[in-house]
Each structure stands twice: as C-alpha cells, then as structure tokens.
Amino acid sequence: MGGIMAPKDIMTNTHAKSILNSMNSLRKSNTLCDVTLRVEQKDFPAHRIVLAACSDYFCAMFTSELSEKGKPYVDIQGLTAATMEILLDFVYTETVHVTVENVQELLPAACLLQLKGVKQACCEFLESQLDPSNCLGIRDFAETHNCVDLMQAAEVFSQKHFPEVVQHEEFILLSQGEVEKLIKCDEIQVDSEEPVFEAVINWVKHAKKEREESLPDLLQYVRMPLLTPRYITDVIDAEPFIRCSLQCRDLVDEAKKFHLRPELRSQMQGPRTRARLGANEVLLVVGGFGSQQSPIDVVEKYDPKTQEWSFLPSITRKRRYVASVSLHDRIYVIGGYDGRSRLSSVECLDYTADEDGVWYSVAPMNVRRGLAGATTLGDMIYVSGGFDGSRRHTSMERYDPNIDQWSMLGDMQTAREGAGLVVASGIIYCLGGYDGLNILNSVEKYDPHTGHWTNVTPMATKRSGAGVALLNDHIYVVGGFDGTAHLSSVEAYNIRTDSWTTVTSMTTPRCYVGATVLRGRLYAIAGYDGNSLLSSIECYDPIIDSWEVVASMGTQRCDAGVCVLREK
C-alpha cells in the first residue's frame, strides 16, 4: 500500500453488546461467577464486577468494608425472587420487562438496588399508563420513591383531567389535605368552578360523619364568585350541607355580593376571584381578507399564557368570508370566497398529526356559502345561511365527521349572510346578518329535537359581520356594521330570561370581526374599523365589565375564521 496513512481511532457498534451477551452466557452457565445472590431461598449466580459496574448499591457492598464484601453468598431482603430475576436480566442485557403486574414491585426494588435504568424504565411505563382512574395513586407512588419527573407528570395529568379524575375512587379516598392541595391549584383545567364545587360535596358525602366538619375549610378554595348567579341560587343554596353551616353561608354570601354589587368587585379581589388558568387552549385565526386587498391563506396561533403569536401551515386555498370551528382536536375551515367564486369546500387541520398539523380536504357542503355561520353541537358541525354569489340562504346543513357526510336540515325563517351562529344549552341561535335588502337585528333559534326555527327577542342594534360567542349563559355579540357605521358596541343575550343588555364597548370599532371565548374571557379578533384592516385583539372580562388590548397578530385581516383548540 503506497502513500502515508494517518492513524485513526475506530469504534465498533457491536463490541459492548457482544461483551454483554458473552457475560450473560457465562452467568447462565455459572462460569466465572464469584458471588451468589440469595433471594427467598433461591440462588442467583453473578459476577461482582458486573453488578458493581451497574449498581452503586453493589459497588459499595463489594468495595467497602461491609460484611458482604468477601462472602460468596449475599442475602438480599425486600424483594421477590421473580423481581430479582428481572433485575439481573437487565444488568446483563440492558433490557427490562415491565408490566402492569410487576411495576409496583420492580420500581421499589430498582430504587433499593440503585439500578437507575430500571427506575427510569418503570417511570416511563407508569407515565404511559396514566388515566383519570389511577393518576392520583401513581402520583403518590412516585412521591414515595422520589421519582420527581413521574410525580410531576401525574400531577399535571390530574390537573388537566380534573373533571374526570374526581369521578373515580382514588379522589374520594384522598385525605382532606390532599383534596385541599388539588382544588386550591390554579392550574386545574375546568371550564367553570362547578366541577370543583361538586367534587368537594361528593367527597364530603362519601363519609358524611367524618368529613362534614371539613366542608368550610375545603369550600374556601372553591372560587364561588366565578360561578353564575343561577348556579349559586339553584344549586349551592339548595345544598343541605351549605344551609347547615354558618361558615359556608358566609362564603356563599360573598359570592352573591360579588355579583350583586359590581362596584365593590375591585375591593374583593383575591384567590377566590382569580380565574384558574383553565385548559391549555390556544386561539387560531384562519384566512380572511388581507392587506393586499385579496383573500389570504395565513394561519396564526395565539397562546394566552405567553401572549405570543406564531404561524401554522397555511390552508391549501385562500379564503375570505370563511367560517371555522373546532371539533375533537381538529379545525374545520368551511366555505368562503377565493376571489372568484363562493366555496362549498371544507379543509380540516388534524392538530394531533405532527408538530404543526396537517391540512386535508373533507366532504364539501351541499351549498356554496360565504359569510355563513358555523358552530358545533355534540359530535356534529352545523352551518347556516351565507351567500352563494347570487342569493342569500335560509338553509342549514350538518356535517358528521364519522361518515364524512353533510345533510340538509330545516330552513331558517330569514335568509342571512354575515350572521353569527352559536350553541347555548343545546339550542342553536342565529343572530343578525344581512338579507340582501336590510341589516338585521332579528334572532332565531333552532331546536335539534323538533327541527324547527323560532324567533326570540331581537338585538337592540342591527348588525351584520358581528362576532358571536357564548360566555356564562350569555350570548355576546360584538361589533359589526349597522348600515351606516362600523360598531364598537357590545350586547349580551341572557338565554334564561330572553333579554338583552348592553355591556362596555370595545376600544375599537370592528366589522367582520372574529369572536371566541378563552379561559373565561371573550376575545374580539381583528376586523375592519371603517378605515383599515386590523391585527389587534382585545379581551373582555365579564367580571369587571372591561376590555383590554392584548398582543396583536402578525397579519392585518377581516373576514377570518376563528376558533379555539386544546393545545397538544
């Protein structure tokens, strides 16, 4: 061989594995073994050097002046022979067999013998098995064995799935202190305080004699001022445990005062009036009409916890006058106008598919619709009204994602484009819009059980292109256009009393504005103020009846689709 060859260190990929395999064969044939581990009268031949290399426990045993240092036999207490066999297999093969049946013995044994790899494998296995019925037990198990990452994962899981967790026996069997720790946490994800109150009452009722005295202590961590007045009067006031306790009554009176005396709310701020962080939800804004005076395909995501915007993959077709809803971790972008024609096509974002999500087409609607209203009820998507390029529609259709099919339903009484569609207490409401001649203030509701539309009390103001959302038993209608002016005004419909009230106006007029609810607050997104497209967002707090501007999007737009999705 000619030329000068430089030396090179070469590492093979098989050497370490080959050595392990050879040592395991020597162990199984009891060759060169220099120690025997005795567990439950069963002997396990092994090599001191291998045990010491894998375990600090054995390293200390064989290198210090412990009595076992020179003994040919070592008795191991605190684990079973079956568990010892699994642990030795790991020492010699790098593989551990973890099952639901053995993990509760395997993890403590791994901690005892200081086998970090087995401990980590058990923790990862238990984390993969978390569900609402076992997360509290796994959290305690992890805490006992100082598995910090697993304990935190179980804690987060119990917070994220609180309404389901409290339905299971593990919650009912918690101590008072453990219940307090859970319900006082800001991070539990609930849409309202109702499941928190009900969890406390159910826990007390499970052992009434022993736990009744604990109710006032627990109830102070329920944020009753954030409950609706109706729930306070109809449910909490009727609860016998509450009526029999002066301390509990004081907490209920505080909640009533919070609602009846809004001028005192600023003085009553504290832990019970602070909203929980809620579900890990994000706001998505899709398509619309952009600053280039044409439909756009841009998708942006807002995280209310960080107050930051980021971009997601664009929709496959540019659309304005678009409707959008979320259902089962998917976002549906429905109809709209691409600059040439109104659309019946529907795109779906599978947000669980990968880091950013994947857009794909689903079945088109039966009717082309721009400026249609869209909402969800149960497992279905409902779309009503809209403009097909020649006429406004009274029709409504429903999409079943399980069979990827649209079906026509009963017609509205009035043709509408630019109307809002929202569900409240199982009823679909369609609000305002434009019928081709007039801007509308009329409102009609659809009962899915009868298939019929009926009129309800109209809005105080005619509005088309308004944002509509449900918050605390009230349907809020924000902004829009009344035929002469772009509106900043906001009104709220009480579904219980069939009546409207005016609330504080937005800081900016907004037409073709998106509206949605996130973490107990109402968001008004982008729109057109009569002079320019907007990228600004403002947020309404119903407790203090006030709007504040939050972080702006990167894109100015109106006519966009807006919805909320639970973050991965």
Swiss-Prot record:
Chief subcellular site? cytoplasm
Q: Which SMART domains match?
A: BACK, BTB, Kelch
CDD domains tied to this protein: BACK_KLHL12 (cd18452), BTB_POZ_KLHL12_C3IP1_DKIR (cd18242)
> Which BP terms in the Gene Ontology apply to this protein?
COPII vesicle coating; endoplasmic reticulum to Golgi vesicle-mediated transport; neural crest cell development; neural crest formation; protein monoubiquitination; Wnt signaling pathway
Q: Does the keyword Transport apply?
A: yes
Localization (cell) = Cytoplasmic vesicle, COPII-coated vesicle
Q: Which Pfam families match?
A: BACK (PF07707), BTB (PF00651), Kelch_1 (PF01344), Kelch_KLHDC2_KLHL20_DRC7 (PF24681)
Q: Where is this region: Interaction with DVL3?
A: 405-568
According to the entry, every stretch annotated as the BACK domain falls at 135-236
Q: Which UniProt keywords apply?
A: Cytoplasmic vesicle, ER-Golgi transport, Kelch repeat, Repeat, Transport, Ubl conjugation, Ubl conjugation pathway, Wnt signaling pathway
Q: What GO molecular function annotation could you give as one example from this UniProt entry?
A: identical protein binding
Extract the coiled-coil ranges from the record: none
Has keyword Repeat? yes
Query: Where is the BTB domain positioned along the sequence?
Result: 33-100
> Where are Kelch repeat segments found?
282-329, 331-379, 380-426, 427-473, 475-520, 522-567
Q: What's the PTM story here?
A: Ubiquitinated by the SCF(FBXL17) complex, leading to its degradation by the proteasome: ubiquitination by the SCF(FBXL17) complex takes place when aberrant BTB domain dimers are formed.
General function of this protein? Substrate-specific adapter of a BCR (BTB-CUL3-RBX1) E3 ubiquitin ligase complex that acts as a negative regulator of Wnt signaling pathway and ER-Golgi transport. The BCR(KLHL12) complex is involved in ER-Golgi transport by regulating the size of COPII coats, thereby playing a key role in collagen export, which is required for embryonic stem (ES) cells division: BCR(KLHL12) acts by mediating monoubiquitination of SEC31 (SEC31A or SEC31B).
Q: What is known of its domains?
A: The BTB domain is required for interaction with CUL3.
* Quaternary structure note: Component of the BCR(KLHL12) E3 ubiquitin ligase complex, at least composed of CUL3 and KLHL12 and RBX1. This complex interacts with DVL3 upon activation of the Wnt signaling pathway by WNT3A. Interacts with DRD4, KLHL2 and SEC31A. Interacts with PEF1 and PDCD6/ALG-2; interaction takes place in response to cytosolic calcium increase and leads to bridge together the BCR(KLHL12) complex and SEC31 (SEC31A or SEC31B).
UniProt xrefs under PANTHER family: KELCH-LIKE PROTEIN 32, LD33804P
Q: Know the name of this protein?
A: Kelch-like protein 12
